[in-house]
């Protein structure tokens, strides 16, 4: 019985380690020469790394969410909240700051990149 419990605990711990190391999940829903549509899922507490936007893009929030934005210029952290159905625009070449999901469940977005 002890061996079974220890095996279950070790398996659970390994699962948590694997899940913790996974970056935001991306699933390309549609792509052609003009556009790419991707569903992105952000796990609680997981940062999305900073980057430069390669294309103009529209982001549609599929879930209510709360996230921390780390300003790349000043290092200032701000909390932002979005509602399901909110839509935002970003220009090509913009600095995409580090974002961290502050909620207790994953949230999803649809990113429409114009090529």
What are these language model-derived features?
Residues 2-20:
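Single-pass membrane-anchoring alpha-helices
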Residues 54-73:
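Glycine- and acidic-residue-biased ligand/ion/polar-headgroup-sensing regions
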Residues 24-49, 53-59, 112:
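A short glycine-rich, His/Asp/Glu-containing loop-to-beta-strand
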């Amino acid at each position: 019985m002890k061996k079974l419990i220890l095996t279950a605990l070790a398996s659970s711990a390994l699962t948590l380690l694997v899940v913790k190391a996974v970056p935001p999940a991306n699933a390309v829903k549609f792509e052609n020469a003009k556009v790419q549509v991707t569903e992105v899922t952000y796990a609680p507490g997981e940062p999305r790394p900073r980057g430069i936007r390669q294309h103009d893009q529209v982001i549609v929030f599929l879930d209510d969410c709360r996230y921390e934005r780390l300003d790349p210029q000043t290092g200032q952290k701000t909390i932002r909240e979005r509602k399901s159905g909110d839509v935002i625009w970003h220009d090509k070449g913009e600095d995409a700051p580090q974002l961290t999901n502050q909620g207790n469940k994953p949230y999803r977005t649809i990113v429409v990149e114009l090529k």
